[in-house]
Amino acid sequence: MIVDGTKNATNDQFFNYKTATTYKALDINNCEFYGAVSGGTVMKGFYYVNVAATIEAVNIRNSYIHDITCDGGDMFDCRKGYMKTLNINNNIIYNCAKERDFVRYDDAAKSFNNPVPEINITNNTIDNCMNGVNGKRILYVRFNGKKAGQHIKMTNNLITNTQAVYTNQATTSTPEYSNNYYFNCTNANIFAPSDSGNSLYWNGDTSGRNGSDPKYKAPSKGDFTIGNEEVSKLKVGATR
């Protein structure tokens, strides 16, 4: 399914939860979603939860998501609800969240008896996101941060051309990092450990570093085939 947001009457998110109730899982698979950078509808974000809703899961898989500038909201944005599980898996995400955060999950935990949500971000190619200003966050996640926190995994992702950090929040749990690859990530704190004594809560991927250019085939056309054999053999990014 292809969802063209460029001619929407409003710039609301593609998915906007407006009723405080319990929802079954939202399962997005093998789709394309896009908005306009200019000359059309500039979307606020991908999803938005600003009510006390309980959502079993949000699964975003095997999809192309691009040109969602996030004018007025963050990319994956939950403010008052509780998503039990967020899975972002095997997607190509590019030209998004120009000056906004990637995953935002505010602390509404006390309304839901302080559960521990799971966030799994695996095998994605993320290019030119959070790249309009320095220091935006991949994980602006604070849900239940004053209690047991969150369970976050970042695995096998290819992250390129960004000025983002992972976080700068004391209430964001340190993710489990494994086999992520980076190129032209210009803010060194994306790799920095936390220093709670100095209130520097980077929670970065200390095993990561900027590597070689993956040499995408034709990124302007949405083709992120990896041309660098040394990067390709690491099995990072989306397999599309």
Residue positions per predicted region:
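N-terminal targeting or signal-anchor segments and their processing/structural boundaries
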Residues: 21-24, 53-56, 81, 109-114, ...
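Intrinsically disordered, low-complexity segments enriched in small/polar residues
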Residues: 15, 45-46, 92, 103, ...
